[in-house]
Amino acid sequence: MATTSLAQPAIQSQIDTPTPLRLWHLTSLWHLTSLDAPTVAVTWTLAFAWAAQIHLPLWLPITLALAAWSAYIADRLLDAHRAYLSPTGVADTCSLIPDPCSLSLRPRHHFHWKHRRVFIPLAFAAGLAALSLVLVNMPLAARERNSVLAAAALVYFTSVHNPWRLATPKLSLRLPKELLVALIFTLACAIPTLSRISPRIPARRPELLIPTLAFIALAWLNCQAIETWESATPSRNLIFPLAATLTAVTALIATIFLAGHQALIAALLATAATSAALLALLNRHRHRVTPTTLRAAADLVLLTPLVLLIMPAFTQ
């Protein structure tokens, strides 16, 4: 997910030895091709709509997926470009030993750089397709409303990849990047549903704000876990207690909603609690899998709301 895919690279370069299980081959490829973020984005968007009993137009999740894919590809290519840039200002594509800062890249960055001739046109095509869908299908009022979130995402993205950011540390964003990514990503998934809630809809906007906050916390936990696991100088690992706390609190709130006959909201919260518990489990067993598999699994566990989408909707 959502995820710290927009964060800076920080650990050693290595391409993991493929695991013998085909499932993990596919999962790793899903991550390496940056398809993890758009998959999570679409799943969460449809899950919020499911909980509110709202049918979103097909173009909307497609647009979100294309925009997320384009942004994450661009982020990883820009990270790789900066790391591989030679002192002369030209990417050193022929050298068997890349620029020293490229040694901090992760497998996903190397994969994107190696296949940049494919990813660059794909990113442009996905971005243009998303923009076209917005211009053709989104009402003007909705565009104005969503422009605030789009501007926030653009400001964050440019601040991360601003080549002069190290020279102006006082101008850097003070809010932790993991929280910023979590806020932008989750709100992009929730706003299509929140903006369509009316008095005739069983799930009122305040009620859906609770799971929105829960998923923001889940996205932050995912980003924080990835940052902790991939950091070259990790601080104290607090992922397990944080995940356990989020699991317990979210499960308790889900129980309260269920007791109040809000079964759909409760089910959505239950999937968030399950994802948090799975992140805690991943943290406990993180040393048993390769870094790429661990990184892919961190986003894979965010897909628990898929259970809601494949089961028949039930009424409250």
Annotate each predicted stretch with a short phrase.
Residues 14-19, 87, 94-103:
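Short polybasic linear motifs
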Residues 20-39, 80-89, 105-124, 141, ...:
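Interhelical loop and helix-boundary elements at the membrane-water interface
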Residues 46-59:
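Short, hydrophobic transmembrane alpha-helix segments
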Residues 56-69:
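Loop-to-helix transition at the N-terminal end of transmembrane alpha-helices
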Residues 66-81, 151-164, 187, 216-231, ...:
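Transmembrane alpha-helical segments that form the membrane-embedded catalytic/substrate-channel core
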Residues 116-162, 244-291:
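Transmembrane helix-loop-helix
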Residues 178-223:
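Functional transmembrane core segments of multi-pass inner-membrane proteins
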Residues 307-316:
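Juxtamembrane boundary at the C-terminal end of a transmembrane helix
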